[in-house]
């Protein structure tokens, strides 16, 4: 159960950008974008969303929680796979409408539900006038059927 609450963002832009209060600016759906990188090597792992409850739980527990837009529910990262994200640092951008989590991943060291370390395992390019995807990291850190069958 969350106990932390967030004050409304200040009207004064200077206070928002340089003041000491963390006053996240959630969008019209009550969400804030979270960029997640590895605390050790800086690799981009995922982009997700948090509602106030997920953000509060993350701050209170030190474990990353997100809001799933597709499932419309709170989710503790790694609750099914065991790849829990321990939060080492949280930063916010200048206008406090996005956050950056630096995490250490437990379990199989995989963040993506596909079993890969990162959700960003493909590059985007153009081939013969068509946008194409190329897989650049095809290493699976765990067996999907085994891990998700256990949950």
From Swiss-Prot:
Its cofactor is Mg(2+); Zn(2+). Residues 1-13 have a biased composition (Polar residues). Coiled coil: none annotated. Keywords: Amino-acid biosynthesis, Cytoplasm, Histidine biosynthesis, Hydrolase, Magnesium, Metal-binding, Zinc. Binds 1 Mg(2+) ion per subunit. Zn(2+) binds at residues 94, 112, 119. One of its GO terms (molecular function) is zinc ion binding. Its EC number is 3.5.4.19. It is an enzyme of class 3 (hydrolase). Signal peptide: none annotated. It comes from the Bacteria. Pathway: Amino-acid biosynthesis; L-histidine biosynthesis; L-histidine from 5-phospho-alpha-D-ribose 1-diphosphate: step 3/9. GO terms for cellular component: cytoplasm. One of its GO terms (biological process) is L-histidine biosynthetic process. It is found in: Cytoplasm. It catalyses: 1-(5-phospho-beta-D-ribosyl)-5'-AMP + H2O = 1-(5-phospho-beta-D-ribosyl)-5-[(5-phospho-beta-D-ribosylamino)methylideneamino]imidazole-4-carboxamide. Mg(2+) binds at residues 93, 95, 97. Belongs to the PRA-CH family. NCBIfam families: PRK00051.1. Homodimer. This is Phosphoribosyl-AMP cyclohydrolase. It comes from Sinorhizobium medicae (strain WSM419) (Ensifer medicae).
């Amino acid at each position: 159960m969350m106990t932390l609450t967030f004050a409304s963002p200040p009207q004064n832009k200077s206070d928002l950008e340089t003041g000491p209060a963390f006053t996240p600016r959630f969008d019209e759906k009550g969400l804030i974008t979270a960029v997640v990188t590895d605390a050790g090597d800086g690799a981009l792992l995922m982009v997700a969303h948090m509602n106030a409850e997920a953000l509060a739980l993350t701050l209170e527990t030190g474990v990353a929680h997100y809001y799933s837009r597709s499932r419309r529910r709170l989710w503790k990262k790694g609750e099914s796979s065991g790849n829990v994200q321990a939060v080492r640092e949280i930063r916010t951008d200048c206008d406090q409408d996005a956050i950056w989590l630096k995490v250490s991943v437990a379990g199989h060291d995989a963040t993506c539900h596909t079993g890969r370390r990162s959700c960003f395992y493909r590059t985007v390019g153009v081939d013969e006038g068509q946008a194409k995807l190329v897989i650049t990291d095809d290493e699976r850190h765990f067996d999907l059927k085994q891990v998700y069958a256990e949950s």
